[in-house]
Amino acid sequence: MANLTKLKIVTPYAQILEKDVYSVELKTSEGRITVLPDHNPLMSTIENHVAYIRELPNTPRKPLLLLDGIVYIEQHQVRVFSDYFKFLDEIQIDEINSSLNQLKHDLNNEEDDKKKLQLKSKIKLNESILIAYKDR
C-alpha cells in the first residue's frame, strides 16, 4: 500500500472533505505546489484555483475548485480552510450563472442595507467560482 496523506478541507458552509490521498496540488500565494507524503511542514495562503488530488500514485488526478483560504501542511496531513470547495464535476455553471443573474436583479431592487450586503457577498462568491472555474 502506498504511503498516504490525510487531506481535510473545511469551509464556513460546513462543506467537509476528509480522505486519504497520495498527492494534493494547490495554488498558493507563492505559486503552485504538490504535496506528497512526508512533506515538510508548511503554512501558506491559497488563492482561487482548481486544485488536484490523486488518491494513489498511478491514478488520475481529480480536480476540485478551491477559493481563498489557508493550508497547513504537516508530515502526513494537509488541512485546508477555504471559503468554498467543490469537485469540478459537481459544479453546474449554468446554475451558477442563473443564480448570479438573479442575485444581481435582487440587489438592484433591494432597499435594506443589511440584505444588500448579504446579496453582494453571495454575488462575490459566485463570481469567484466562475473565475476560478474558467482558469482551470
Curated annotation (Swiss-Prot):
It is found in: Cell membrane. The keyword Transport applies. Transmembrane segments: none annotated. It is a peripheral membrane protein. The keyword Ligase does not apply. F-type ATPases have 2 components, CF(1) - the catalytic core - and CF(0) - the membrane proton channel. CF(1) has five subunits: alpha(3), beta(3), gamma(1), delta(1), epsilon(1). CF(0) has three main subunits: a, b and c. This is ATP synthase epsilon chain.
